[in-house]
């Protein structure tokens, strides 16, 4: 089964993300469980938690279909001790919020070395941050998102993801989310069915499909290997649509959230239908 949805707004309460997903015909969704541009947020209220769980049950969303995203402020590889501690504390809070909502995944951008420490040191800090978080909060899997490689962001090479996972002690509590725009911008060609075969074979060899816990399905405004992260709609931009056909007809992408973060929310329902039309039963 393909779980397809979008990163919907949780404005007015996280329970509203469920209803907004139903409106666009989704059977998956992503959300922020707090304001993504603030360090701290009020705790989730009991009635909010109850409504979220009830709405998920009524509309048949299981935890496997929901991919929460953490705050953009968090940098789990921060070279500065004070800011690293602040990021780790915020990440644990994000994990705790997911656990309170009955969710089992938390998607995050791995981190940046800020040109102050080596890549290896930064990757080790990210892995240590994951170890601390999963020791602090039960049930929730830390899902590392591949990046486009802008600036000093790590996670744009499969080897970065593999190196983090290797240093995480509990392999059951770590996974990966692949973003198609980020893959392309990082230099992984996914513009044809043949190049998709090669790129995802490389992913399986270096990281392993057993760690794939979600996908972000996005077009790109920039060229292959641009190292610039600019999302586009599915059918516009530089990647083309073969990658989406590949994903929709490959069992490796079954039963994980396939999440749109494309730039026109008003056509998300149409894009979900487009993806479903690519399935060759």
From Swiss-Prot:
The keyword Nucleotide-binding does not apply. Keywords: DNA damage, DNA repair, Endonuclease, Hydrolase, Metal-binding, Nuclease, Zinc. Zn(2+) 2 binds at residues 145, 179, 216, 261. It comes from Glaesserella parasuis serovar 5 (strain SH0165). Gene3D superfamilies: Divalent-metal-dependent TIM barrel enzymes. One of its GO terms (molecular function) is DNA binding. Binds 3 Zn(2+) ions. Belongs to the AP endonuclease 2 family. Zn(2+) 1 binds at residues 69, 109, 145. Pfam families: AP_endonuc_2. The lineage of its organism: Bacteria, Pseudomonadati, Pseudomonadota, Gammaproteobacteria, Pasteurellales. SMART domains: AP2Ec (SM00518). Disulfide bonds: none annotated. GO terms for biological process: base-excision repair. Endonuclease IV plays a role in DNA repair. It cleaves phosphodiester bonds at apurinic or apyrimidinic (AP) sites, generating a 3'-hydroxyl group and a 5'-terminal sugar phosphate. Zn(2+) 3 binds at residues 182, 229, 231. It is an enzyme of class 3 (hydrolase). The keyword Manganese does not apply. InterPro entries: AP_endonuc_2, AP_endonuc_F2_Zn_BS, Xyl_isomerase-like_sf, Xyl_isomerase-like_TIM-brl. This is Probable endonuclease 4.
């Amino acid at each position: 089964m393909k779980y397809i949805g979008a990163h919907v707004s949780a404005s007015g309460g996280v329970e509203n993300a469920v209803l907004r997903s139903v409106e666009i015909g989704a059977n998956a969704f992503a959300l922020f469980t707090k304001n993504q541009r603030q360090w701290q947020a009020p705790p989730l209220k009991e009635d909010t938690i109850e409504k979220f769980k009830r709405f998920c049950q009524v509309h048949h969303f299981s935890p496997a279909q929901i991919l929460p995203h953490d705050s953009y402020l968090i940098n789990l590889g921060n070279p500065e001790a004070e800011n690293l501690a602040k990021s780790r504390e915020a990440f644990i809070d994000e994990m705790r919020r997911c656990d309170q909502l009955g969710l089992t995944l938390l998607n995050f951008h791995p981190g940046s070395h800020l040109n102050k420490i080596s890549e290896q040191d930064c990757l080790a800090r990210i892995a240590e941050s994951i170890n601390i978080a999963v020791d602090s909060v039960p049930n929730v899997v830390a899902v590392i998102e591949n990046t486009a490689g802008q600036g000093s962001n790590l996670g744009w090479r499969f080897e970065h993801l593999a190196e983090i996972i290797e240093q995480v002690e509990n392999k059951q509590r770590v996974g990966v989310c692949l973003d198609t725009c980020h893959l392309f911008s990082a230099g992984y060609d996914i513009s044809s069915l043949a190049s998709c075969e090669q790129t995802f074979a490389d992913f399986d060899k270096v990281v392993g499909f057993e760690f794939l816990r979600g996908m972000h399905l996005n077009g790109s405004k920039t060229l292959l290997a641009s190292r610039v992260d600019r999302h586009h709609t599915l059918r516009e931009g530089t990647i083309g649509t073969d990658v989406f056909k590949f994903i929709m007809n490959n069992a490796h992408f079954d039963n994980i959230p396939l999440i749109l973060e494309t730039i026109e929310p008003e056509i998300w329902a149409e894009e979900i239908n487009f993806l479903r039309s690519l399935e060759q039963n």
